[in-house]
Amino acid sequence: PQTDGRYIGYCPEGWSYYKLSCFKYFPEPRSWDEAESRCQEVKKGAHLAWVEDAHEAATLRRTISYYQRVQPVWIGLQKSKESQAWQWTSGKDYSATREMPGNGARGGSCAALTHHSGFSVWSSADCSRQHHYICKFYP
């Protein structure tokens, strides 16, 4: 297995890395919009975490579980007001990303990972709800 040594300076202190991205868990309750703004304040180029493959989804799960196992966590997925399609904060449409299953049927236009699925399936939720969140950026 690859050691972490060569990546030590890759992400800022307190941030985890996966492939080429860095992400960080914030255990402070915020609405989805506040959380997204906070990500951008904390680090230039950061957004609520978007998911590009199944391994990255697993890394998010592990990160969340390390901190807690009961609270929902906002991720960077939101239903577009114009198209009504789910869209990642990276700008990509969700349908193109089959790596993380989700359920948009619960009402609400923002996506949270919940402990019911072991943080592996997103559920739609009211964007004004206050949840913990996870930010991501490419250094």
PLM feature spans:
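Extracellular, disulfide-bonded carbohydrate-recognition/adhesion ectodomains
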Residues: 1-139
